[in-house]
């Protein structure tokens, strides 16, 4: 089972690919998709879509796991995040991948044992749980790894 974990965002989206082979979890790859806030939103969404599509084609995931988002007090920010999630979900649907959504507190509790863990705690635990993640320093990327990890350990694959 290969999971594509996604920490959705319009400006700095984290993605990660984690596999489960013979009851062993294996980190395959991860990265950040950054868009320029000065670009038109449709160009930013197209860039996210085309970059994630390359990841899907390279790693052939069976499923995508995406973090649920909360409504921000800033309605414009929430709307833009909704656009990014829509573009991501459309791509997931186009490749006929199963998809699971996880609340941030669920991901934190699964990875650290504490549902309100800080970003540095998440990063530390990801590095302990999955070999190959030692060079990850970006919290968006670490969150994507954590989302994929959560999907694999909570869904009994």
Swiss-Prot record:
SUPFAM superfamilies: Ribonuclease H-like. The active site is at residues 7, 67, 140. Binds 2 Mg(2+) ion per subunit. GO terms for cellular component: cytoplasm; Holliday junction resolvase complex. It comes from Rickettsia africae (strain ESF-5). PROSITE patterns: RUVC. GO terms for biological process: DNA recombination; DNA repair. The RuvA-RuvB-RuvC complex processes Holliday junction (HJ) DNA during genetic recombination and DNA repair. Endonuclease that resolves HJ intermediates. Cleaves cruciform DNA by making single-stranded nicks across the HJ at symmetrical positions within the homologous arms, yielding a 5'-phosphate and a 3'-hydroxyl group; requires a central core of homology in the junction. The consensus cleavage sequence is 5'-(A/T)TT(C/G)-3'. Cleavage occurs on the 3'-side of the TT dinucleotide at the point of strand exchange. Homodimer which binds Holliday junction (HJ) DNA. The HJ becomes 2-fold symmetrical on binding to RuvC with unstacked arms; it has a different conformation from HJ DNA in complex with RuvA. In the full resolvosome a probable DNA-RuvA(4)-RuvB(12)-RuvC(2) complex forms which resolves the HJ. Its cofactor is Mg(2+). It catalyses: Endonucleolytic cleavage at a junction such as a reciprocal single-stranded crossover between two homologous DNA duplexes (Holliday junction). Mg(2+) 2 binds at residue 67. Keywords: Cytoplasm, DNA damage, DNA recombination, DNA repair, DNA-binding, Endonuclease, Hydrolase, Magnesium, Metal-binding, Nuclease. Belongs to the RuvC family. It is found in: Cytoplasm. It comes from the Bacteria. Its main location: cytoplasm. Mg(2+) 1 binds at residues 7, 140. GO terms for molecular function: crossover junction DNA endonuclease activity; DNA binding; magnesium ion binding. This is Crossover junction endodeoxyribonuclease RuvC. Pfam families: RuvC. The keyword Transmembrane helix does not apply. Its EC number is 3.1.21.10.
